[in-house]
Swiss-Prot record:
GO annotation terms (biological process): intracellular signal transduction
Catalytic activity line of the entry: L-seryl-[protein] + ATP = O-phospho-L-seryl-[protein] + ADP + H(+); L-threonyl-[protein] + ATP = O-phospho-L-threonyl-[protein] + ADP + H(+); [DNA-directed RNA polymerase] + ATP = phospho-[DNA-directed RNA polymerase] + ADP + H(+)
Entry annotation: catalytic residues: 125 (proton acceptor)
Binding positions (ATP): 10-18, 33
Gene for this chain: CDKF-3
Taxonomic classification: Eukaryota, Viridiplantae, Streptophyta, Embryophyta, Tracheophyta
Keyword Repeat: no
Protein name: Cyclin-dependent kinase F-3
Amino acid sequence: MERYKVIREIGDGTCGNVFRAYNTETNEIVAVKKMKRKFFQWEECISLREVKALQKLNHPNIVKLKEVTMENHELFFIFENMECNLYDVIRERQAAFSEEEIRNFMVQILQGLAYMHNNGYFHRDLKPENLLVTDGTVKIADFGLAREVSSSPPYTDYVSTRWYRAPEVLLQSSAYTPAIDMWAVGAILAELFTLSPLFPGGSETDQLYKICAVLGTPDHTVWPEGMNLPRSSSFNFFQIPPRNLWELIPNATLEAIDLIQQLCSWDPRRRPTAEQSLQHPFFNVGNWVPRPLHASHTKTIETRPNPRLELNLWDFGTEPEDNYLDLTLSLKPSFPGTDFSNNVPEHTKEEILLYPGFENPPVQSGFWPLVASDRPMGDVPAMSSWPQAYVVDGQATLPAVGFSGSPFGLSPLQPNLFENRSFATPIRQVNFF
């Protein structure tokens, strides 16, 4: 260790102290973690979970272990240097993060986590302090509590900082899964919006209360297995209805709220994996934005070959209203990726926005009602089954979670949408399937 000169201490944890130092031979700045316990055999050192995990994990969003050395029964880990951690970034923040900034943080966290889980490890101690940041790059650190996914239970019950601890751990489950990491990710995502913890419990019992105060007290219909865990009787003291997350996180979008709700599900089996989370609509940027736009906001879109047109007439009734509901023009692309907005009447075209930079979209169809644009729309019933990002007749619907082809759909788009005349209601915008 003679070649490393300590600059200052930057962290003090349960297992060790962390110092910023530089290599006197190369002048490279590094982070040195000095373990608190004594080691007498080299075999003890290389058998540590943190060493074994970091030897196997090599990813841009996982901190790099450069060297392990032992002197006078003291063990030192030499890591790449990072400027700060996410806790420092949140604490020093004067204004809320933009959604773009939050999305950038979360993509990196989930990418590192997906790699870790796919390579047989789960972290068990995800929290802002263990997410290191340099120039917008985020890396997962501190694998002292990491376990192999294939390892056999029982696991220790005291893992992760309390505020980010999954309920199955609080209830002393001995056979939890990588889903405990996903709970922590949900809590961190919420904190990035509010700059304060979502579940700031003062004790383990208070932590359960704080979770119930947000999610509502679970029962056998919400989390059957959880009701049989050792400490599940604690719920008898907390009979609380769920809160509306829009009230707690007013600056979050519908997609962000939905992702938080799924990640922070009582039942760990309902939480998406890291890979599934990356496919959530919250991360679907550069795609179309389904909301009404004024003509001045309409984007100019590159001209492409004309699409094939089909006129579909469904079973008409005898009343004029039946014809009004059932006559629809269907446009199907002549090839995948067709952009047909240039052939749309101006009053319809102003209702949509396609991002020119979005490449390789799925084959889509658009539907327009063949009725006069000045026909009154106030009496038309709103569709109840659209996903949360859709806007019907200029009004955003409440989230009916799910996008077609996504693992996040409680109810995907109706496959028989046009077999039922009640769903053929004209919509004052273009909808893509």
